[in-house]
Amino acid sequence: MVMLAGAAGAGDLAFDPGATLSCLAQSDLNRSGAFDCIGRSASACMATPDGGTTVGMGYCLNAEWQWWDARLNAVYSQLMNGHRAADAEMARLGIAAPSLADSLQAMQRAWIPFRDAACDYERATWGNGTGGGPATAGCLMVQTGRQALALESRLGQ
């Protein structure tokens, strides 16, 4: 659980990933239904009295984005380790195949600027409005959650 105390009069906000985890536990990670779980915990956080302010919304959305980012980094590491081992085995066997590790790295490096551009566009749609900060955090949360789930669906394949 992550806490925010007294930020700009927001009082105490707490982010707990429980709602998202519960949703994921009931979904099949290989199906699009898992995508519906993205934002569940941020929504629960924003449903609290202090979560409905602009500062509160930004905090809640950012907290879930950071949670998904940690999850994405963990699954990326798992996949990279497995892919490096598979690439080494293919080389040992003399099989010329595209590198899984290099392909994963290239894909992830291309995805990051896509995510950033998509969320820059989301921010731009708000002009100078105060909702732009939470909108950007929400976009980053959704894009990162989708990428984490996409990579998680590759585990065990």
Task: Describe each PLM feature range.
Residues 1-3:
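Sec-dependent signal peptide recognition
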Residues 9-157:
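N-terminal alpha-helical modules
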Residues 5-7:
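N-terminal signal peptide c-region/cleavage motif recognized by signal peptidases
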